[in-house]
């Protein structure tokens, strides 16, 4: 099976990971969501900035000594952890709502310690920028969600091709280079974080770097657009072949993070499963084509505006087969949500996961709610049932938790989703947004439970 490093995943924010600024600490590790199912959803939901674009973009702030101003930054646990990590290196940061201003002029500690990196795989994204600008980086090997092997060897191989001297010992990657040199890099697999790390490193390298088999995800493209705004020279943006002409230095820039296509897809899926009429605002439909096509196949009516998406659904959805693959195909980060949709659909459908092994941990929990799902290797057969029944379930990772929320919206009675710190890593106030469109969802804090 092909394993792709495809998502900037993290697990739990540690106590030290709340940065300066006015971003509040979110959920306690024992928070739960209580969902009373059976309500139609109607109204408007504003889509937040994309987590998987914001994390590399924050790390790109290391590449310049001038301020980088970012808008539409989501207020998420992973973002706060990244800001804490950057702050420990000497990065100064000012936050005002969804605007973050980064100043890396005084960065003097190019080390990413285990205490922070263990909570978030995306921490590896500091490796390329630190090495390119400072000639040295010491980064702990990452932790993250338990959804399969997501190796960092492609990052290391690419940086070595650019002349870096890299040693791994005592759980740390230690990298040195006087100045990186341009190189032709062919990754063994499509890796999103690998592409981003090598792209950032190449912007300050001496000469031309070509990245073949590059990831084409919109989040990679968004990072590239910021880098160009900072003075980088990049050709082939949005394709699988990136050509970068290194420059001596990058300057400051202003950039708005793209909308979160996975958050948008999750809400579209929720409406398609539970029924209703909801308009998503601040969303670009073209980055969600594969998901929209499948929702239409399931029976949803979706109208695309300039920056809006309206989804309407009456009656039960029809079962739809999905197969995950790299962008622009169906995203692995929407697989669990479609599993919940298929659980209440008419008919049966096969769900095939080609990106990660071990990404069916939500199946057992969905079956606790009355779903009929059988797993065979990397394929699940979902046979729809007329009704799910509320029960206590446990989130195992970020997207699995979203699938349990969708299932809870469709279930009779109360569903209690435990361990929602996973949800808070990737969704900005999900329960608040769902409540605003008529769902009966409330957070039970750890102190109440």
Curated annotation (Swiss-Prot):
**What gene is this protein translated from?**
murA
Basic and acidic residues: compositionally biased ranges: 1-12
Q: Which Pfam families match?
A: EPSP_synthase
Q: Which GO terms describe its molecular function?
A: UDP-N-acetylglucosamine 1-carboxyvinyltransferase activity
InterPro entries named among the record's database cross-references? Enolpyruvate_Tfrase_dom (IPR001986), Enolpyruvate_Tfrase_sf (IPR036968), MurA_subfamily (IPR050068), RNA3'P_cycl/enolpyr_Trfase_a/b (IPR013792), UDP_GlcNAc_COvinyl_MurA (IPR005750)
- Protein name as annotated: UDP-N-acetylglucosamine 1-carboxyvinyltransferase
- Give the E.C. number(s): 2.5.1.7
What is the annotated localization of this protein?
Cytoplasm
Can you name the source organism? Burkholderia pseudomallei (strain K96243)
Query: Where is region (Disordered) located?
Result: 1-30
Q: What does this protein do?
A: Cell wall formation. Adds enolpyruvyl to UDP-N-acetylglucosamine.
State where UDP-N-acetyl-alpha-D-glucosamine binds.
Answer: 121, 150-154, 333, 355
Q: Name one GO biological process term.
A: UDP-N-acetylgalactosamine biosynthetic process
Keyword terms of this UniProt record = Cell cycle, Cell division, Cell shape, Cell wall biogenesis/degradation, Cytoplasm, Peptidoglycan synthesis, Pyruvate, Transferase
GO cellular component terms given for this protein: cytoplasm
Q: Which reaction does it catalyse?
A: phosphoenolpyruvate + UDP-N-acetyl-alpha-D-glucosamine = UDP-N-acetyl-3-O-(1-carboxyvinyl)-alpha-D-glucosamine + phosphate
Q: What is its main location?
A: cytoplasm
Q: Which residues are phosphoenolpyruvate-binding?
A: 51-52
Q: In which pathway does it act?
A: Cell wall biogenesis; peptidoglycan biosynthesis
Q: What are the 2-(S-cysteinyl)pyruvic acid O-phosphothioketal sites (modified residues) in this protein?
A: 145
Describe the family membership recorded for this protein in Swiss-Prot or TrEMBL.
Answer: Belongs to the EPSP synthase family. MurA subfamily.
Residues at the active site = 145 (proton donor)
